[in-house]
From Swiss-Prot:
Recorded metabolic or biological pathway in which this protein acts: Amino-acid biosynthesis; L-tryptophan biosynthesis; L-tryptophan from chorismate: step 5/5
Residue pairs linked by disulfide bridges in the UniProt entry: none
Assembly and interaction partners: Tetramer of two alpha and two beta chains.
Keyword Amino-acid biosynthesis on entry: yes
Entry protein name: Tryptophan synthase alpha chain
Organism of derivation: Escherichia coli O17:K52:H18 (strain UMN026 / ExPEC)
Length: 268
């Protein structure tokens, strides 16, 4: 949890926003997935948002569903994902690592056991995509017991009550949704979300990172100009993996070429 605090403090000092890529662990296989993550960090990623492949990804658009299927095809299991997380943490001791996942996976381990495992491998935050704030008590209590930040999604139509709850229960960062619907780079992010950002700040929420439909540097800049602390990009990155699936080296070069200008756009 503290890794987010120190990251946001450092970025503030440098007058920068955060650029956070999302990928699915184990896509397209364990070895290449670890290389992908190293490449994202080398290219300027400030934090990581990682998916654990699971059979029923509700909020995911087709691009990220395909990533899940590729990881399954490679035989990747949740247990192996935790081994990968431990390796990533060893190699990159300071970068904040967040998981974005679904409740079934948490339940299949047992809620407390799941967060205990997160703490053990050095995961900083968990966003359970299909658990709304009002049903989140057992998840967020277990998370806090194990020093893991519970992350909540703030939808574009959030009312005042919801904003207060998100501010009160969330830690680490707030996932600010560009728009409703499923993830995907082809659905460009609709801005501005200034009024939500203003309210979240007023209620002392964790810093907002804008996600969903972020696929170009101008959108990263627009999110930060609207008051977000940074931006999360998933489908656009996963699409690059898909496009270069048979050329692992070219894939890494293309990922680097995508991330560098996205990170550059966070510098005012």
């Amino acid at each position: 949890m503290e890794r987010y605090e120190s990251l946001f403090a450092q970025l503030k000092e440098r007058k920068e926003g955060a650029f956070v890529p999302f990928v699915t662990l184990g896509d397209p296989g364990i070895e290449q997935s670890l290389k992908i993550i190293d490449t994202l960090i080398e290219a300027g990623a400030d934090a990581l948002e990682l998916g654990i492949p699971f059979s029923d990804p509700l909020a995911d658009g087709p691009t990220i569903q395909n990533a899940t299927l590729r990881a399954f095809a490679a035989g990747v299991t949740p247990a192996q994902c935790f081994e990968m997380l431990a390796l990533i943490r060893q190699k990159h001791p300071t970068i904040p690592i967040g998981l974005l996942m679904y409740a079934n996976l948490v339940f299949s381990k047992g809620i407390d056991e799941f967060y205990a495992q997160c703490e053990k491998v050095g995961v900083d935050s968990v966003l359970v995509a299909d658990v709304p704030v009002e049903e989140s008590a057992p998840f967020r209590q277990a998370a806090l017991r194990h020093n893991v930040a519970p992350i909540f999604i703030c939808p574009p139509n959030a009312d005042d009550d919801l904003l207060r709850q998100i501010a009160s229960y969330g830690r680490g960062y707030t996932y600010l949704l560009s728009r409703a619907g499923v993830t995907g780079a082809e659905n460009r992010a609709a801005l501005p979300l200034n009024h939500l950002v203003t309210k979240l700040k007023e209620y002392n929420a964790a810093p907002p990172l804008q996600g969903f439909g972020i696929s170009a540097p101008d959108q990263v800049k627009a999110a930060i100009d609207a008051g977000a602390a940074g931006a999360i990009s998933g489908s656009a990155i996963v699409k690059i993996i898909e496009q270069h699936i048979n050329e692992p080296e070219k894939m890494l070069v293309a990922l680097k070429a995508f991330v560098q200008p996205m990170k550059a756009a966070t510098r005012s």
